[in-house]
Amino acid sequence: MYFDELDLNDNVLDALYDMRFETCTPVQEQCIPEILKGNDLLGVAQTGTGKTAAYLLPILSKLDDGGYPKDAINCVIMSPTRELAQQIDQAMQGFGYYLNDVSSVAIYGGNDGNRYDQELKSLSLGADVVIATPGRLISHISMGNADFSRVSFFVLDEADRMLDMGFSEDIKKIAQL
């Protein structure tokens, strides 16, 4: 199936074309329509099959189409590691290249205070998409640095790995916000 056969936003499609992506992988073909319909889902596929695009593309399309608060965090994507959070953020920048009003911030530990200050600034400005490791996000939550009451999309990337790493209580706490 081709991406242009799906109901993706034109700005997202333009970014895909620039990146030379034309056809969906099976996980994308199955997940994208369901997310566009607003359905919850559990996507399971091997590494390298396009799972990140399977959830990012429809979320970015929906955010760019409007109907979500401009001054709010609308999507939280949880990642078990800093490296994966950075990869997701890079994918977000590529897929969202033509989106003028959709912003993101990657939040993860293991860096200096300057990075924390940048995270705090992005959170206070209301980044649309927050990509975070559980521990670092809990830190921001406990300090009251962000309002998560208007989140419409909640993604657990590599959920099995996060649970194996002992993040189940953190995830429950974040999901209840």
Question: Which stretches of residues belong to each language-model region?
Answer:
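Conserved pre-motif I regulatory segment
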Residues: 1-44, 157
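Conserved nucleic-acid-binding Ia/Ib motif block in the N-terminal RecA-like helicase ATPase lobe
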Residues: 5, 13-14, 18, 68-142, ...
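Proline-centered helix-kink/hinge sites
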Residues: 24-26, 33-34, 58, 80-82, ...
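Walker A/P-loop NTP-binding motif
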Residues: 29-41, 52-70, 90-96, 138, ...
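The conserved Walker
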Residues: 45-49
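Methionine-biased hydrophobic packing positions in alpha-helices, especially
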Residues: 59, 78, 162-165
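SF2 helicase catalytic motif II
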Residues: 141-177
